[in-house]
Amino acid sequence: AITEATEDILYSYSIISSDVDAGDSLVITASTILPGWLELVDNGDSTGTLKGTPENGDVGDHAVVLRVTDGSGDFDIQSFIITVENTNDAPVFTSEAITAAVEDAEYSYTMVAEDVDEGDELTYTAPSLPDWLTFDDSNTISGTPTNDNVGDHAVVLLVTDNFDGTAEQSL
């Protein structure tokens, strides 16, 4: 059996069964409840397919027990564990940027993001800011625009996880 799968990628295992008794029809079933992301298809010709696409919440080990039964009730069992490996998911911004500032009034926006990968550490940066804005350790950009700053300004904010997954927010 194929015992490794990767998050977000289709897992497929072709099942081929046989019986020494000629003419016996074989039925392939799961002897245990399959993980929600897995589907067992019995093709009706002594073959079947175990397939599915695991998601982030499926990372880890999953016990599978398959059973093939002939017309006489005789059966055989195949047991194995499928280990689903994590794929890095990029962080996403959960805060909505404030895109308008008022002349001579303080502007402040704190970036907030999340990452579905457990344990990922996030790093916030502001690689493109106008001169009147500053970025601090609390992931906040702030400043007070003057009359000289009236107009549109490109602002680019980034959040990166420790596996180089990145999200960008442009204001």
Regions picked out by a protein language model, each given a short descriptive name:
Residues 62, 74-80, 153, 165-171:
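Extracellular and select intracellular beta-sandwich modules with Ser/Thr-enriched
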Residues 49-59, 140-150:
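Extracellular/luminal low-complexity segments enriched in Ser/Thr/Pro
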Residues 10, 59-63, 106, 150-154:
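Extracellular Ig-like/FN3 beta-sandwich strand-entry sites
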Residues 38, 88-92, 130-133:
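Proline-centered linker/hinge motifs at extracellular inter-domain junctions
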Residues 1-27, 76, 80, 89-123, ...:
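Extracellular ectodomain surface segments
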Residues 40-45, 134-137:
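Short beta-strand segments within Ig-like beta-sandwich modules, predominantly Fibronectin type-III
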